[in-house]
Each structure stands twice: as C-alpha cells, then as structure tokens.
Amino acid sequence: MDLKLKDKVELIIAATGDSGTATAKAFANEGCTLAVTSTSQAKLDALIPQLKGAKAVKGYVCDITKEADVEAAVNAVVSDFGRIDVCLTCSGYEGIHQEIIDATYEEFDINFQINFYGCLWVLKHVGRQMKVQNGGTIVVLASNGSYVCCGGIPAYGACKHAVAGLLKSAAKEFMAFGARVNYICPGGLDTKLMRKTVENFLPGKTYEEGCEIFSHAYLDNRLCTVEDVANAMLFLASDVSSHMIGDALCLDGGLAVDRK
C-alpha cells in the first residue's frame, strides 16, 4: 500500500533511541524528508548514514526538557524545509522503583520533565507551526501506562496518565486548524528502557529471563518490538488513518483487554 508519505517533511523527536531509530528507518524507506533530533550530536552523526532511503536528512540537537531547545529546533526545521507535515515524538523515561510512601520530588520531577513537559513543549511549538500552515499530523509514543498502572513506578504512571489527557486536549484544539493528534500505547517494549524495568521489578534476573517472564503477561506471549512501533507510526502519520483523532493505538498484546 502506498502511504503517500514520500513528499512529506517528518520531524522525529528523540530519533536516536531504539524506537526513534526504527521509526526513522521506516520513514526513510518511504522516501520522506527527515528532520531528526537527539540530545547528542554524536548519536545523530551515527544515525544519519543509516537513513539512506530518505529524500533528505538533517539532524538537530535538542533537549525536550528545555522549551527553548524545542522552539529553536522547530524554527530551524521550518527554515530548512519550509514546513512540518508530520511530527513523531519517541522520547521516554521510566525511572527507578520507588513506592509512593518513599516518593521523592526528584523522581517525580524528572519523569514529568521528560515524559510530560517534553511532550507539552513539542505540542506547543509544532502546533503553532501547523496552525500557520493549516494542518499536519502529530503522533506521540506514549505507553500502556497511560491507561493502566503498575505499583512501584507511580511517577511514571502519573505522568503517562497526564500525557494522555494532554494529548486528548491537543486533539480537540488542533483540529480547529486541521492538525490531527494521536498516540501509541505499547506494553512491554523490547528496548533499553526494558532493562530498567527488569531491574526494577525482577532484581537478580538477567534481561533475557526478565523478558521471558514479562512476555507471559501478553496474549501472544511476546513483547512489543520497535518494528511494531514504527509500523504504527507509519499508519497514524498517513491519511490511511485520517478518521483517527485523539485516539490511542494500543500495542499491548491484549494485556488490558478487559479494561479498555
């Protein structure tokens, strides 16, 4: 199926993480123009040569916890390419195992700075550009933590629920100028962040042992992959999903089938 993304300008936030890299490669294969961000120039330099199918690629150093960085990156992309047709946000942070009775400001703060405020600043400044250009599409990598919670990581659960509310608000506001907002909610995702999850919940287990244990929570007995995420990003970025607005695309292997 031709997703008609070839001539689109795609901004991929946090493109050098596991999910971001898989997403960037998938959109490069569609022949898109790619603007990719990372907190590290060295990581951008390593990623860009891998995106051979893209029409054009340029990297931008950006820390999404800093609004000024996000604003500068968005302005630079528009200066370089004229517009932003699609914005894909792939950042994420889980943190440490910490129960509510042991909660610290620092742990909640870093979760909200990355997962919530980072998303807010991207929505704010990309949304402004999409209002100017009368349209666009935004897809955010969220989490099944946006609708279910695990004990022991309350900061993560709280901010992911907050992100879902923020995205639903953005979906309502942004359709006034023709921009769609949707988000993806994977369950256990086989990335470097999963190593932190294994450490948090299964101390003493190897990563492989932890993944095997976690996989049994899903009806298909496997974790979500970065390729699953990239394919969902392609779908939501394209007009194939044009009637989806403010929706969560769940990639959770049926984990929460009784709660949806």
Give the predicted meaning of each segment:
Residues 16-18:
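Conserved glycine-rich cofactor-binding loop
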Residues 97, 234, 245-260:
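Short C-terminal tail/terminal secondary-structure segment
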Residues 98-100, 104-112, 214:
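Substrate-binding pocket helix/loop in short-chain dehydrogenase/reductase
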Residues 99, 103, 149-157, 169, ...:
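Active-site loop-to-helix junction immediately N-terminal to the catalytic Tyr of the SDR YXXXK motif
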Residues 123, 159, 167:
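Active-site helix of classical SDR
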Residues 143:
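Residue(s) in the substrate-gating loop at a strand-loop-helix junction
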Residues 175, 180, 244-246:
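Short, small/polar-rich loop/turn modules that mediate ligand/substrate recognition or access, typified
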